[in-house]
């Protein structure tokens, strides 16, 4: 039975009911709806709507229902209730009779669903932060195990300067750290309780909403009833955070795909996260990484869809807002799956140290060191940049690395070059010189790993 049938003289068309009903997806809010109902029952005691005995009877029945939901949430889908609020109320009435009909006094589904989705989002933030933390720890562990794996760093997908695989890992630790902090920020803003706002103008009962907020695990009650039932900022913020984090994970996946390719052969991915071809028996495809990359668009699409849904809505609640749930459910599920899969990808990775070093020795990635060497000899940097560019062209024509040129050859371009030039052209020298905070020197990378381990412990 619908919660609003008294006003209507005709039954809803089945096609409309199927179109309108949301139980098939908002059943995921069952636990939050029950917990919110327990909190509301206590508030109704304070204003004399329920006796203490009635409240205890309701709470006992709701707790029993909560146990049933947790043991088999899919069973909810066998019901034809309009939404999760209707389902909970119906099951409560089945357990306690007419007493269950008193629970909705002073409450609207508008503030009820606003509460439910906020409570659900708060719980997901905690779960997502746990997954992000685990992935960061796995990246730090991988970095610690690969501090001596020298590889090319890239700009424009061209070899640029030598780095280490550890330094690459730590870059993603930083990105995920920002994702984690954005979740913390979002949590603080969503930690206000909308229950007691009614349909839009507030409840007619003198509920202590601040106490109600505390009872339900919030810091404070919301300040404006009209805003409270209309607000979906927390959903947009979480979708935004998810989208940005998925961009980070997609970049991670793209790097892995490139590093794993036959052309690079920098890393070997575990059989546990790769698949084969139905035709080509030699194939070992990086499907886990490709799916992470592909799913980024799905999450970003949910953000765009939510913004488009909200942008033209007048205050207060509109049925359009029912469209918030499927997007946030799917996006956060997808994000969490991708975080966990990225950690699994790292779990079995093998770095081909010989191949990464071989690649780092090519592409004249030590050219900047030669420019800095000339600067140290008194040549202005802009001039040294030009000189080294000409030197690289010559080396390419001679099919030689810079460190393979003789001093005489160097002197064709600058007479300040001496035998000491070879000391600064080695890969180790290139790394050691990048010793400012955040640089790729082994000392700084080791410090970054130690700091991250302490921060994440």
From Swiss-Prot:
SUPFAM superfamilies: L-aspartase-like. Its EC number is 4.3.2.1. Gene3D superfamilies: Fumarase/aspartase (C-terminal domain), Fumarase/aspartase (Central domain), Fumarase/aspartase (N-terminal domain). One of its GO terms (molecular function) is argininosuccinate lyase activity. Pathway: Amino-acid biosynthesis; L-arginine biosynthesis; L-arginine from L-ornithine and carbamoyl phosphate: step 3/3. It is found in: Cytoplasm. PANTHER family: ARGININOSUCCINATE LYASE (PTHR43814:SF1). Belongs to the lyase 1 family. Argininosuccinate lyase subfamily. This is Argininosuccinate lyase. It comes from Pasteurella multocida (strain Pm70).
